[in-house]
Amino acid sequence: MTQTSSLWVGVISLFPDMFDAITDQGVTGRAVKSGLIDFNCWNPRDYALDKHRTVDDRPYGGGPGMLMMVEPLKKAIAEAKKAAGDGAKVIYMSPQGRKLDQQGASELASSKKLILIAGRYEGIDERIIESYVDEEWSIGDFILSGGELPAMTLIDAVARLVPGVLGHNQSAEQDSFSDGLLDCPHYTRPETLDDKQVPAVLLSGNHQEIAKWRLMQSLGRTWLRRPDLLHNLALTEEQAVLLAKFQQEYQKACG
């Protein structure tokens, strides 16, 4: 980890060039270029034992598909851990892992050093997981061709929580899920678009009323679209009043 970086990330992948999407573009790209995030990649193919740089092997017991070869993967993990120094958390991106959410991203951001293993083929040897992996994480109940896209998703979610990565300190705080709620609607110019007006309160200049409106919309949108999230929240008195007001206005509008 460099002196200025707030997050050290190491990725083990057979396709390291895929990660150019987050190291060269957007807020994560700027964070890498500015040194807030120290990003590194290790390709198991560089540690292959034969001239063909073989990185896959047959699974014991037969069956379709191949597994990532153990020795190149072990060496890549060892090199990543050596570069990271003490305290690095090794994560395997796996559909069997804990499902990533905002709370999980916040927990991972506090780790400061992350080594992500992006699997390919049918996965990796179970003994590698048992001996070298600290945690398994998933981005959802669906199948992808490899762990690179899940790893990039995790990196992006965690990077947004690193101080200084976003242009405005409140940006991460106002994102969906940051307080357990969905985000409120947002509007920009023009004031009228296809005969639809920007809500008057947003033009009022009354910051207290604007904040109250945004909170009410956030509560209402969560109630409409993700009511399960409300079950995990202990609403304040103000939030309960605003949600009740939103529900009343919504039911009135629906007739």
UniProtKB/Swiss-Prot annotation:
CDD domains this protein is in?
Answer: TrmD-like (cd18080)
* One GO MF term attached to the UniProt entry: tRNA (guanine(37)-N1)-methyltransferase activity
User: What EC number(s) are associated with this protein in UniProt?
Assistant: 2.1.1.228
Q: Which UniProt keywords apply?
A: Cytoplasm, Methyltransferase, S-adenosyl-L-methionine, Transferase, tRNA processing
Its localization reads: Cytoplasm
Gene Ontology terms: biological process: tRNA N1-guanine methylation
The record's NCBIfam families line, in alphabetical order, gives:
PRK00026.1 (NF000648), trmD (TIGR00088)
Instruction: Report the family membership.
Output: Belongs to the RNA methyltransferase TrmD family.
Q: How does it assemble?
A: Homodimer.
What's the protein name? tRNA (guanine-N(1)-)-methyltransferase
Lineage, uppermost ranks: Bacteria, Pseudomonadati, Pseudomonadota, Gammaproteobacteria, Alteromonadales
